[in-house]
Design a protein with these regions (language model features):
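Surface-exposed loop/interface segments of Gram-negative outer-membrane beta-barrel transport/assembly proteins
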Residues: 1, 16-18, 27-119, 135-227
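Transmembrane beta-strand segments that form the barrel wall of outer-membrane beta-barrel proteins
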Residues: 8-13
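Long hydrophobic segments that form regular secondary structure
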Residues: 125-130
Length: 227
């Protein structure tokens, strides 16, 4: 007869390539086991949360395309939104804006994903006879996910846009899933002399449900509309 348990907590941070980007992971694991004569009972519980943040500094590739001699600040030391304008070849070719990704540090910004999950597994086994065992188990998993991206109307992505109703963007995705399963089994083994008889039966039922919602909108004249 014995009761055993094991508790584990973990945390990790993986910095991204760009400043203020990265992924944080947190987890908790609890394992219980109880044995008494013919009985063996086990339960395992796991909780996990993972969050990833993208950098307000933009992507690394944006900086590799910039001329290192561009002046990135004005006379007051503040980052400018526009670094340069280049004319396209040909008649009526127009111009291309060379934007400053550092300018977006002044703007309201949000870009992250977050996932949370709970997993619980339960199992019970009984040795009714020396050669006859019966077991049953159940498991349930529940998870949620969320993604949000908000860019201010002053973000450099909207620099060439003149229509105020198309300046600023917000997108959000949420999802949840629940799955469960229940099983039962019986096994019988009989040995006599050189002969062996084995019988095994198993019954299982499971279900999985998923739901998701995706939203996106453009036109945010107020930076506080992402709250």
């Amino acid at each position: 007869e014995a009761l055993r348990y094991n508790l584990g907590i973990n945390y990790s941070r993986e910095p991204g390539v760009m400043k203020e980007s990265g992924r944080n992971s947190m987890g908790l694991n609890l394992s219980l086991q109880y044995r008494r004569k013919k009985w063996n009972i086990q339960n395992q519980l796991s909780l996990t949360n993972v969050r990833g943040d993208n950098s307000p500094y933009g992507s690394f590739s944006q900086y590799t395309k910039l001329n290192p001699y561009y002046r990135k600040t004005d006379e007051n030391g503040r980052y400018t939104s526009l670094l340069d304008q280049k004319k396209l070849p040909g008649e009526g070719g127009g111009t291309v804006n060379i934007v400053n990704p550092l300018y977006n540090l002044y703007q309201k910004y949000k870009d992250f994903t977050e996932n949370f999950s709970v997993v619980d597994n339960f199992n019970i086994e009984c040795a009714i006879l020396e050669n006859l065992r019966v077991s049953a188990g159940a498991s349930i998993t529940k998870g949620t996910s969320r993604m949000e991206v908000f860019k201010s109307m002053n973000h450099t992505d909207f620099l060439p846009e003149t229509d105020l109703t198309r300046k600023g963007s917000y997108s959000k995705s949420t999802g949840d899933n629940v799955s469960w399963s229940v099983n039962a089994s019986v096994s019988y083994n009989y040995t006599k002399d050189k002969h062996l008889l084995s019988l095994f039966g198993r019954w299982n039922v499971d279900e999985n449900k998923n739901n998701s919602v995706d939203l996106s909108a453009m036109g945010f004249p107020n930076d506080n509309m992402d709250d």
